């Protein structure tokens, strides 16, 4: 499909500050390797050498997955839409679904702007609204939107554009390069529902 997804394969580094987290990361890494996942288990000195800007005094080690990456959500959406259209799908934009049509426990279409659209397949791709739409037809979708906080720094000189996403589960924080700046995200153990 001729559209950029903004794919960056910078990898991901999960780090451990505690012995229990370090054991957990190594156990997960060993299991992942059994399934062919490319990864490297790094000790504190290897992390310091590979990422000299990072403070590592309190680390036990980490797991680097060099094949991990991130993509631009808008670009991915456009790529998927273009591919779907090429495959014969019809996309109705700015057309809120009023309800999903069911008969004998099976989905057979949707109602949009008072018009019933019959179809063989319905893809429920409504993100944080999926739970409410599923409830209308008796389908439980264990998903809800939650508050999420992040900050973006001013540009940082010498910040590598190939810095992996760094996840610190002990501190509930992640870091990633974003256009020469550092994006710092915080994830909560008990998320607050957004609505």
Where do the language-model regions lie?
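Residue-level signal for well-ordered alpha-helical positions
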Residues: 28, 53-54, 136-137
């Amino acid at each position: 499909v001729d559209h950029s997804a903004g794919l960056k394969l910078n990898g991901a580094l999960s780090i451990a500050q505690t012995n229990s987290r370090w054991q957990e990361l190594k156990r997960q890494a060993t299991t992942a390797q059994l399934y062919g996942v490319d990864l490297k288990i790094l000790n504190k000195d290897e992390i310091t050498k590979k990422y000299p800007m990072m403070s590592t005094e309190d680390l036990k080690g980490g797991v680097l997955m060099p094949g991990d990456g991130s993509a631009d959500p808008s670009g991915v959406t456009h790529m998927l839409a273009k591919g779907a259209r090429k495959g014969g799908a019809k996309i109705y934009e700015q057309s809120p679904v009023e309800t999903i049509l069911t008969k004998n426990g099976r989905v057979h279409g949707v109602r949009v702007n008072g018009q019933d659209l019959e179809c063989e397949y319905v893809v429920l791709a409504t993100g944080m609204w999926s739970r409410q739409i599923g409830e209308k037809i008796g389908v439980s979708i264990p998903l809800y939107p939650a508050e999420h906080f992040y900050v973006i720094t001013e540009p940082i000189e010498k910040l590598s554009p190939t810095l992996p996403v760094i996840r610190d589960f002990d501190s509930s924080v992640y870091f990633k390069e974003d256009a020469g700046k550092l994006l710092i995200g915080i994830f909560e153990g008990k998320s607050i529902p957004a609505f």
